[in-house]
Curated annotation (Swiss-Prot):
Lineage: Viruses, Riboviria, Orthornavirae, Duplornaviricota, Resentoviricetes
UniProt-annotated binding residues for Ca(2+) 2: Q177, D228, V229, D301
Gene3D superfamilies registered for this protein in UniProt: Glycoprotein VP7, domain 1 (3.40.50.11130), Rotavirus outer-layer protein VP7, domain 2 (2.60.120.800)
InterPro entries cross-referenced by the UniProt entry: VP7, VP7_1, VP7_2
Keyword RNA-binding among UniProt keywords: no
Record localization: Virion; Host endoplasmic reticulum lumen
Positions annotated as glycosylated: N69, N146, N238
Protein name: Outer capsid glycoprotein VP7
Family according to the record: Belongs to the rotavirus VP7 family.
C-alpha cells in the first residue's frame, strides 16, 4: 500500500520536474530565436532603404517648429520643396556650390537645410509628360519662348493638372468629347490635326468623310496640341501618324501642390479653357528675365508667397502628367 503511494508521489514529482525542464527549454529556444531575429534586423537595417512616395527623399512630415533664422515670425510648417529648372540655368551659373548657396538662402525664409531639392530638366516637353513631382510643394521654372507661346500654355495645363488618358485608334473609329474636361492630346515632332464633325447619319458636317482635305485644320505643325471640339458630336480625326500620337484624355483635377513660375515674357500664361471664367493665374506667376542668379534670388524672396496659393501635396503620389489606361 505504502509502495503504491510512494510510486504515485514519485511519478508526480518526476512529471513536475520534466514539465519544468520542457518549459525552460521552450523559453530558452524562443529567447534564442527572438535574439537572432532582432540581431538580424539590427545588422541589415543600415542597408535597407525604404521609399517615400516613390522616390528616395527624406520626407520630414508635418512638424510645427520655429526657426530663428526665418524672416517670418509665424511657426513654419516643415515640408519638402522641389524646385525644377532648365539645365541651361546650371550651365550659365557654372558654380559647383550654387545649390548649397541657395539652400542657405532658403533657410532665411524658414526652409531648413535638406528640405529644398533642386532638379534640372533638359526639355520642358519631355518633362511635362512625366514630371515626377514628389515633394510636398513643387515649383517649376519655365523659360518663356515667344516662338512657342501656345505650346507653353498647353504644357502648363499638363503640369498643373492630372490627366487620365486612353489610346485612340482613329483609323477605325470616330470619337466624341463628353464634357469640358474631356480633351484629345496630341504629341510628336510635327502634329497636324484635322477633324470632321458628323451628324446623326455619320455624314460629314461641312466636310466629306472620304476626303481629309475637306477636314477642318485645328492645329498645324505643332509639337503639342490639346484639341477641344463641340461636346457630344462625333468626329472623324486625321493626324500625321508618322510624327504624332493622339490620346483621349480626361482632366481629373488640379495638382494644387504644383506651381509654375514663368521666366520672362510680357504676360503670365493663361491656361483657362472656359472663356467665361476669370483667367486661372493663381498658380502661374511671372518674373522678369534676367541672369539666372537673379531669377533664383527672386524665387527665394517670394517663395513663401508662392506657397500660400498652393495646397500641400496632391492626391497623386507619383504625379505623372498622364495616367495611361490600356
Amino acid at each position: 500500500m505504502y509502495g503504491i503511494e510512494y510510486t504515485t508521489i514519485l511519478t508526480i514529482l518526476i512529471s513536475i520536474i520534466l514539465l519544468n525542464y520542457i518549459l525552460k527549454t521552450i523559453t530558452n529556444t524562443m529567447d534564442y530565436i527572438i535574439f537572432r531575429f532582432l540581431l538580424l534586423i539590427a545588422l541589415i537595417s543600415p542597408f535597407v532603404r525604404t521609399q517615400n512616395y516613390g522616390m528616395y527623399l527624406p520626407i520630414t512630415g508635418s512638424l510645427d517648429a520655429v526657426y530663428t533664422n526665418s524672416t517670418s515670425g509665424e511657426p513654419f510648417l516643415t515640408s519638402t520643396l522641389c524646385l525644377y529648372y532648365p539645365a541651361e540655368a546650371k550651365n550659365e551659373i557654372s558654380d559647383d556650390e550654387w545649390e548649397n548657396t541657395l539652400s542657405q538662402l532658403f533657410l532665411t525664409k524658414g526652409w531648413p537645410i535638406g528640405s529644398v531639392y533642386f532638379k534640372d530638366y533638359n526639355d520642358i516637353n519631355t518633362f511635362s509628360v512625366n514630371p515626377q513631382l514628389y515633394c510636398d510643394y513643387n515649383v517649376v521654372l519655365m523659360r518663356y519662348d515667344n516662338t512657342s507661346e501656345l505650346d507653353a500654355s498647353e504644357l502648363a495645363d499638363l503640369i498643373l493638372n492630372e490627366w487620365l488618358c486612353n489610346p485612340m485608334d482613329i483609323s477605325l473609329y470616330y470619337y466624341q468629347q463628353s464634357s469640358e474636361s474631356n480633351k484629345w492630346i496630341s504629341m510628336g515632332t510635327d502634329c497636324t490635326v484635322k477633324v470632321c464633325p458628323l451628324n446623326t447619319q455619320t455624314l460629314g458636317i461641312g466636310c466629306k468623310t472620304t476626303d481629309v482635305n475637306t477636314f477642318e485644320i485645328v492645329a498645324s505643325s505643332e509639337k503639342l496640341v490639346i484639341t477641344d471640339v463641340v461636346n457630344g458630336v462625333n468626329h472623324n480625326i486625321n493626324i500625321s501618324i508618322n510624327t504624332c500620337t493622339i490620346r483621349n484624355c480626361n482632366k481629373l483635377g488640379p495638382r494644387e501642390n504644383v506651381a509654375i513660375i514663368q521666366v520672362g515674357g510680357p504676360n503670365a500664361l493663361d491656361i483657362t479653357a472656359d472663356p467665361t471664367t476669370v483667367p486661372q493665374v493663381q498658380r502661374i506667376m511671372r518674373i522678369n528675365w534676367k541672369k539666372w542668379w537673379q531669377v533664383f534670388y527672386t524665387v527665394v524672396d517670394y517663395i513663401n508667397q508662392v506657397i500660400q496659393v498652393m495646397s500641400k501635396r496632391s492626391r497623386s503620389l507619383d504625379a505623372a502628367a498622364f495616367y495611361y489606361r490600356i
